[in-house]
Amino acid sequence: MNEIKKTYKNYVGGKYVRSESGKTFRIELKNEFYEVPLTSRKDIRDAVVAAKKGHTAWQKLSPYNKTQVLYRLSEMLVGNFETYQQLLQDAGLTKAKAKDDIHKAVDSIIWYAGMADKWEQMTGNLNPVAGDFFNISHQESLGVVFTLNSNTQSLNSLLLNMLPALTVGCSVISFNEENSVLALKLAEDINNSDLPGGALNILSGKFELLIEDISNHVEITAMAIYKEIHNDQKTMIKENASKSLKRIFINPPTMGLEALFPFIETKTVWHPKGR
């Protein structure tokens, strides 16, 4: 019987979709070639539409429910431990390092799951003001966030590029290049983790082909660049982003409370004190 090779697709709006371009690019893992989608401009636009809907659905869940959903993802990873281990070993990691990376990935998810219903208490505050008023800082998620993920062949690194924005209630468009096979495999577990469709979208492709379209898209609220890019690309992104006041973060933190700060904005509420 002939071997049936797995067909990897983008994950957008809770569905597996082929690229509108009809094109793929090749990734080699342990002398075996994988064809993954070459995302087009139309695919990016579709992902933004899905992410906007996903943001609304993700925001409707209570913080406690978000915690449950993220914890469910850690359970899915544990259930597919051997599959991830083999992928990481095919990418060049030793068996011991692959196992360690997956254990760290599970720990990272559990940490962020625990933060999903606590971060607002830890970042908001009551501000001292003159007069008989309460002045309270309230934090909200930014909206649709595009992440350019690191090329590091690491499940933990991949998740840490997505989780900070997702934890505070943003929807995420996760873009991957050399680690696309790992990312698209992760999409299968995300699909089974009860995350609302569109809250997390995973694409593969070549960033340099789409950099202008992504940085110019007015409905992408923020871009988090976790991969090393050229200075001229950074300049282009910042110039294009300025037209829509898009927030740009180059190599932001990936762990700890400070990793959440780029993806939230502060609103203040004034309320008269009772007498």
Which ranges hold each PLM region?
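Residue-level signal for inorganic ion chemistry
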Residues: 30, 66, 169, 200, ...
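Alpha-helix N-cap/helix-start motif
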Residues: 20, 81, 98, 155-158, ...
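Conserved active-site and cofactor/substrate-binding residues in soluble primary-metabolism enzymes
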Residues: 42, 46, 100, 104, ...
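Conserved small-residue-rich beta-alpha loop and adjacent elements
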Residues: 110, 114-193
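N-terminal Rossmann-like NAD(P)+-binding subdomain of aldehyde/semialdehyde dehydrogenases
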Residues: 1-131, 164, 177-178, 192, ...
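Conserved NAD(P)+-binding/catalytic subdomain of aldehyde/semialdehyde dehydrogenases
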Residues: 129, 135, 139-148, 193-275
